[in-house]
From Swiss-Prot:
Pfam families attached to this UniProt entry: MSSS, MutS_V, Smr
Region Disordered, annotated ranges: 682-709
Protein name per Swiss-Prot or TrEMBL: Endonuclease MutS2
Keyword Metal-binding on entry: no
Organism the protein comes from: Lacticaseibacillus casei (strain BL23) (Lactobacillus casei)
NCBIfam families listed in its UniProt record: mutS2
Length: 786
């Protein structure tokens, strides 16, 4: 992108605003190097990064990038074998700690936020945990080495503290004792790295020791008392040892960094990129900017676009279309009406979008991808235009025409101004034709009425104007697309008090064509305002309808949620009641069995089985409940005496003998006659003869559809095996089997013993015993029924 357009449209001020948002040296470099991009993929990637930054800012307060200095010079010094100082090491330590923090930050968010680019950028980071911990442990943020940097450093510092404590103790005798009256001030100070006291010159003889300094007047001598000379010597030795150990540690840490300088430098660059993304997101928030769509066809539509450098409380937003049906737009209207600002808004927002920045416009705005943006915009708000001004503009236009391509955007402000109106209008039309022949996109502002007709008659060209309020005599700064500007000179003059005679005389001097053109424009403005009013009314009605729809949707969702909750609550309550009934029923069955054992013959076994099976059906079968259509269809089937039916509760096929009532039938199941609920039966074959014509035939269990004659309990838990055994024996009895085989395996013997105990208690079992060796041996039990 040419440098002139960046200067003309004040692109540098956008960069300055971004610089106020970055906190790292590498981030500042990226902002300063920022340029509009011309590759659609690169533009979309840059916008994706800004969108990620905006999401992170909104949800997490931004990517955690702290202030970071430029560490490149320090890394270069390491590469040549130099020893870094504490501040340089602290700066590198902050970079390494930030790498770890951001890596963890993004890893923790991977299941929460679907970033478009940040996770890819995260992969460019190289986490160096051991080196980071080493630097963090050894170096404070201000560059001071910590006591944990080495045991030797910790030891020598403890020694220094001990000696200093002894020195202060002895010095206290001078500052607080009887000799304090000989001091200029009762304090301890340092001269030449040694502790001294300020002694009045006339009392020098009262103190032994060494004089290290004197005051400017000579009235105070700074004396090191003899009693602490040895301590000061020891202190000095310890301090020199500390310095030596610090230098050794700095060299050691610098050597440890040497193998990783390339990775650390790359990390710093990636952190700068994260900082740059943060800055773009913060600027977007400050400007209330949105992400623009990218049109590969250069179909530009800026919705309520605002110039980012104008006070947001004063700026007027405009819809600016270009490139769909029209490649050229001619904007007419009065001076100070906002034409130039409209041009600059279009150009600057286009540059911002191509730089990966959000733009101050409404959602769903679109930008194009132009390889160049050219502009001829000068300070032509003054009417004093001369030949030199015209020449300067024409020189710029010639330069633009030489570089045009079909992917260029050209902005002309007051095209053809500064010369004779007729010649200027002709030149303006010819220049617009030349731009159109290349296929470039152009927006031009002008005063010339001839260009209004040009915009009306030329293909892919549309007129536009800046609205002017004739009542207030003030521009509204609103762009009216499709409506050419009209002169308001007569209206303004009349409202300002110019005699009507003069106004009418002036009107008579212009051609009838001009009158008709102005009248046509006036009618267009009225129609536009009427359409705009109707549109606003429709928009409000649509918004109201949407609001009602949203409320109804929310209410319906709440209703269904509460309904489902109540249904589930009722089902749970019903199942709870059934559980209680089941418990009571089991107790009753147990009592019945005891009665049967005590008084044989009083209770029939099939009654016990029927009662127990019916109780098992008390719980709601949720899949069956949900399949209500099938259940209703089954209930609609007419049943007749003699029909063959499948009884779901027994998993047996039987024959209908007699209907007790609407809900119950007597069914022949093998050797047993059972009372069965209607809704547990499914007709499998219609009757072919009436009950009177069709005799009831007893069918042995062996010929009926029923359970297998073998039950395999191997691999089951004890409780489950016993439950399966109980259910199987009931089914076998109903099927009329004379004998069955129970396979329990050997294992620990628990299930085998359980089977034996169960069969021993069951009064329907005649005999039982292990199978022959060739049929399973002690791993299976053969049961014979009565």
């Amino acid at each position: 992108m040419n440098e002139k357009i960046l200067k003309t449209l004040e692109y540098d001020k956008i960069q300055q605003a971004l610089l106020g948002q970055v906190v790292t040296a590498n981030g500042r470099q990226l902002v300063q190097a920022m340029q509009p991009l011309t590759d659609p993929v690169a533009v979309q990637q840059a916008l994706d990064e800004t969108a990620d930054g905006a999401s992170a800012l909104r949800l997490k307060g931004g990517i955690p990038v702290p202030q970071l200095e430029n560490i490149d010079p320090a890394l270069k010094r390491v590469d040549i074998g130099a020893v870094l100082n504490g501040q340089e090491l602290a700066s590198i330590s902050r970079v390494l700690q930030t790498v770890s923090a951001i890596d963890k930050f993004l890893t923790d968010l991977q299941d929460q936020i679907d970033f478009r680019q940040l996770y890819t950028l995260q992969e460019s980071l190289t986490v160096l945990p051991q080196l980071s911990r080493r630097l963090k442990t050894a170096v404070d943020p201000d560059g001071t080495l910590t006591d944990e940097a080495s045991p030797q450093l910790h030891g020598v510092r403890e020694q220094i503290k001990s000696i200093e404590g002894k020195i202060r103790g002895k010095m206290t005798n001078y500052t607080r004792g009887a000799q304090s009256k000989y001091l200029s001030d009762p304090i301890v100070t340092i001269r030449d790295d040694r502790y001294v006291i300020p002694v009045k010159a006339e009392y020098r003889a009262k103190f032994g020791g060494v004089v290290h300094d004197q005051s400017a007047t000579g009235q105070t001598l700074f004396i090191e008392p003899q009693v602490i000379v040895a301590l000061n010597n020891r202190l000095r030795e310890a301090q020199l040892a500390e310095v030596a150990e610090i230098n050794r540690i700095l060299a050691e840490l610098s050597n440890e960094l040497a193998p990783y300088t390339g990775q650390i430098k790359a990390n710093a660059a990636v952190l700068g990129h994260f900082d740059f993304i943060n800055a773009k997101a913060r600027l977007a928030k400050a400007e209330k900017a949105t992400e623009p769509l990218v049109s590969a066809d250069n179909d530009v539509l800026l919705r309520d676009a605002r110039h980012p450098l104008i006070d947001p409380h004063k700026v007027v937003g405009n819809d600016i279309p270009l490139g769909d049906k029209y490649q050229a737009m001619v904007i007419t209207g009065p001076n100070t009406g906002g034409k130039t600002i409209t041009l600059k808004t279009l150009g600057l927002l286009q540059l911002m979008g191509q730089s990966g920045l959000f733009i101050p416009a409404d959602d769903e705005s679109r930008i194009g991808i132009f390889d160049e943006v050219f502009a001829d915009i000068g300070d032509e708000q003054s009417i004093e235009q001369n030949l030199s001004t015209f020449s300067a503009h024409m020189d710029n236009i010639v330069h633009i025409l030489k570089q045009l391509s079909q992917n260029s955007l050209v902005l002309f402000d007051e095209l053809g101004a500064g010369t004779d109106p007729q010649e200027g209008a002709a030149l303006a039309i010819a220049i617009l034709d030349a731009v159109g022949e290349v296929g470039a996109y152009v927006v031009a502002t002008t005063h010339y009425p001839e260009l209004k007709l040009y915009g009306y008659n030329t293909a892919k060209t549309i007129n536009a104007s800046m609205e002017f309020d004739s009542k207030t005599l003030q521009p509204t700064y609103r762009l009216l697309v499709g409506v050419p500007g009209r002169s308001n000179a007569f209206d303004i003059s009349a409202r300002l008090g110019l005699p009507s005679v003069i106004v009418e005389r002036a009107k008579s001097m212009i051609s009838s064509d001009s009158h008709e053109l102005n009248n046509m424009i006036s009618d267009l403005e009225k129609q536009r305002k009427a359409a705009e009013t109707a549109y606003e009314a429709a928009r409000r009605q649509l918004a109201d309808a949407q609001s009602v729809h949203d409320e109804l949707a929310a209410a319906y969702k709440k209703f269904t949620t509460e309904r489902d909750a109540q249904l589930q609550q009722a089902k749970d309550k019903a199942n709870s009641l059934v559980d209680k009934a089941q418990t009571k029923a089991d107790k009753i069955i147990k009592q019945l069995r005891q009665m049967q054992l005590t008084n044989p013959g009083t209770v029939k076994e099939n009654q016990l089985i029927a009662a127990k099976t019916a109780l098992k059906q008390l719980h709601q079968d949720e899949p069956l409940q949900k399949n209500r259509i099938l259940r209703r269809e089954r209930e609609k089937q007419a049943l007749h005496v003699g029909d063959e039916v499948k009884v779901a509760s027994y998993d047996q096929t039987g024959t209908l003998l007699e209907q007790f009532d609407k809900k119950h039938w007597q069914v022949q199941l093998g050797i047993l006659k059972m009372k069965v609920p209607t809704d547990e039966m499914e007709k499998i074959k219609p009757s072919k003869q009436s009950a009177a014509q069709r005799p009831v035939v007893k069918v042995s269990g062996g010929g009926m559809s029923g359970p297998s004659t073998t039950l395999d309990l191997r691999g089951e838990r004890y409780d489950q095996a016993m439950a399966d055994l109980d259910q199987y024996i009931d089914a076998a009895l109903l099927a009329g089997y004379p004998s069955v085989t129970i396979i329990h395996g050997l294992g620990t013997g628990a299930i085998r013993n359980g089977v034996t105990q169960y069969l021993k208690r069951n009064r329907q079992v005649k005999t039982y015993g292990f199978a022959p060796q060739n049929a399973g041996g002690s791993g299976a039990t053969i049961v014979n029924f009565k």
